[in-house]
């Protein structure tokens, strides 16, 4: 059931994203909401995995595989919402997402690469390897948060 709901929601979000062919016609606030929604969903599916990596939550291979699959898609979604027209919209994103776009893109690519590795490792069933990859993936999240997001 969750997979069906997620698939429908993802299809709606992707459809909305693809229908917005010219960013200049899209309200900057809409782009910010889109990227924030993708980040919230990443947090939802990352939370249990982070808990497993830290030993706070019992390891569950099925949850790892499912959530890693969701994260593989979600890790690609927010980036087209970080455009110059959004710089004046209140959000936690620092101006560096625009002014240092190359470094920001590198961080995005690292995240996507590590999430893809997590998906592959999760299929192998080796708990130690999965936990090691969870740590590596988590570090890529921190790389963006440290350099491109306001400190909380």
Q: Which ranges hold each PLM region?
A:
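Sequence context surrounding c-type heme c attachment/ligation sites in exported
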Residues: 29-61, 67-152
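Feature targets compositionally biased, intrinsically disordered low-complexity regions
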Residues: 8, 14-16
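Cleavable N-terminal signal peptides
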Residues: 11-12, 22
């Amino acid at each position: 059931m969750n997979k069906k709901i997620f698939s429908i929601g993802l299809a709606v979000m992707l459809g909305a994203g693809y229908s917005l062919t010219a960013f200049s016609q899209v309200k900057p606030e809409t782009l910010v909401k889109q990227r924030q929604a993708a980040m919230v969903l990443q947090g939802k599916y990352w939370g249990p995995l982070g808990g497993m990596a830290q030993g706070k939550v019992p390891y569950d291979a099925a949850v790892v595989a499912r959530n890693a699959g969701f994260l593989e898609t979600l890790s690609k979604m927010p980036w087209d919402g970080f455009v110059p027209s959004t710089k004046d919209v209140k959000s936690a994103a620092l101006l560096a997402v625009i002014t240092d776009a190359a470094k920001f893109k590198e961080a995005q690519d690292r995240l996507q690469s590590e999430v893809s590795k997590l998906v592959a490792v999760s299929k192998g069933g080796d708990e130690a390897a999965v936990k090691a990859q969870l740590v590596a993936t988590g570090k890529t999240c921190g790389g963006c948060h440290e350099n491109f997001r306001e400190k909380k």
